[in-house]
């Protein structure tokens, strides 16, 4: 497995919200996105997903 996308519920001063983390095991990177499709697009750009 080269990557995974995890959905987490976070809390801040604006309240509760969902965030999606792209965990890139191949390149040892972690990125946070507000919507899942942006995380998927980034995985495609990095060559992790076809």
Task: Report the location of each language-model feature.
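Short N-terminal "domain-start" leader segments
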Residues: 1-21, 31, 40-41
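A short, charged, amphipathic alpha-helix used as a generic interaction element across diverse proteins
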Residues: 24-50
């Amino acid at each position: 497995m080269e990557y995974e996308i995890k959905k987490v519920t976070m809390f801040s001063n604006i309240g509760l919200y969902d965030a999606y983390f792209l965990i890139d095991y191949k390149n040892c990177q972690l990125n946070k996105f507000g919507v899942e499709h942006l995380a998927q697009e980034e995985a495609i750009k990095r060559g992790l997903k076809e």
